[in-house]
Each structure stands twice: as C-alpha cells, then as structure tokens.
Amino acid sequence: MPKNTNYDLIIFDWDGTIANSSGIIVESIKQVCASKQISTPTDQKISSIIGLGLSEGFRKIFPYMNSAEQKEIEQLYREEYLKRVDDICLFDGVEVGIKGLASQGYFLAVATGKSRRGLNNALNKSN
C-alpha cells in the first residue's frame, strides 16, 4: 500500500477523464444521424450519455427507435467511431500522473461503459 493513505486502488473513468474522446463520440453520432437522415440530438444531449453503455445511451437519445433500428445505429456508430479512434489522445499530464501513481504502489483501474474489446483498442491506440 502506498505511504500516507488508506487507499491502494484508484479507479479512473476513460472517456472525458483520461482520454480526450468526447468530441470524437459526439461527431461519430452526428455522422451516423446524417447518414441515416434521422434527427440529430444536440451536442449537449449526446455528451450526457458519455460513460453509459452504448445500448443504454442510445435508448436515451433515440427513444423512438425499436430494437432492430437501435442495433443498426449502434453498429454504424461503432464503425464510425473506429474510423476516428486514432484521433483520440490522453489529456495533457495524464500519462505522467498515472506513471507516478503506479510508481508509488497504487493499483490503477479504468471504469467505462465501453466493452472490454473497445477499451483494449482505445488503450492500445493511446500508447
């Protein structure tokens, strides 16, 4: 356990906390809406679902869609997001801060609404 603390585990959120990905998420959803010619939620409404699981978030911003329509939109979003994933970077100072915490003996973890595969992909791209 690190010195002078009762905590040995620190859990970080990924999108918008460690990774500067909010703009990519918003733009990906807007592009999907444009390609499907459906009403585009506001940037604020889209931003409000960041951190939720994809299905849960999309139910909130597309409540009028049936299950099949939502699954199609989710798949289109995944494809659009992957086109932009190389543009995601860590916020300034995050890498140094995380390395510093790890060197002090803290266990570090990430909490996210992403799938495990999605998080692994994002981690690999941000190295």
Regions found by a protein language model. Give the residues of each.
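Active-site neighborhood of HAD-like aspartate-dependent phosphohydrolases
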Residues: 2-48, 64-67, 103
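Short alpha-helical
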Residues: 24, 53-56, 96, 117-118
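A short acidic, helix-capping loop that chelates divalent metal ions and anchors anionic groups
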Residues: 41, 56-59, 80-84, 118-120
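A metal-dependent, Asp-based hydrolase signature
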Residues: 50-80, 92, 100-102
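Short, structured helix-loop boundary elements
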Residues: 22, 43, 47, 67-74, ...
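Conserved hydrophobic residues forming the short capping helix/wall of the S-adenosyl-L-methionine
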Residues: 33, 62, 123, 127
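Short, acidic loop-to-helix structural element flanking the phosphoryl-transfer center
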Residues: 6, 83-110, 116-124
